[in-house]
Regions:
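Surface-exposed beta-loop interaction hotspot
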Residues: 1-7, 15
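Catalytic cores of peptidoglycan-degrading enzymes
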Residues: 11-137
Length: 137
């Protein structure tokens, strides 16, 4: 059976300024690349990041492009991804409550400044967090 850890909705994982929106076109070396499938939230390095909804940490690792990255499974094939962290404070297999600190804002991987790249995923689809999350603080 599946547990719906997202029953209370999704909270914003960090307070900050939205600097990149879902679906925006990315340009790399002057060439268009695939659209951005998350939102970028700028905040100072070291700003705490909280789990947007309860769930199980299914990945916490340092990846080439996204730097320190966490994926939390919320049940029913729904997950959230947090990338470019400076530090992670959870590990794969941990269960987290909504609002638990999972890491801090950083500038790791392919990044141009300290921010959180936050994504919500359903199966292999990416969803716009701004349409799903509770009101932005």
């Amino acid at each position: 059976t599946s547990t719906d850890y997202f029953i209370s909705g999704f909270d914003w994982p960090v307070d900050g300024v939205i600097t990149g929106v879902y679906g925006s076109q990315r340009i790399l070396n002057g060439k268009p690349r695939q659209p951005h499938f998350g939102i970028d939230i700028a905040a100072p390095t070291g700003t705490p990041i909280k789990a947007s909804a309860a769930g199980k940490v299914v990945m916490a690792d340092d990846l080439y492009f996204s730097g320190w990255t966490i994926i939390i499974s919320h049940g029913d094939y729904l997950s959230s991804t947090y990338s470019h962290l400076q530090e992670i404070t959870v590990q794969s297999g941990d269960y987290v409550n909504q609002g638990k600190m999972i890491g801090v804002v950083g500038n790791t991987g392919r990044s141009t400044g300290p921010h959180l790249d936050w994504r919500i995923n359903w199966l292999d689809k990416r969803l716009d967090p701004q349409l799903i999350a509770n009101k932005h603080p």
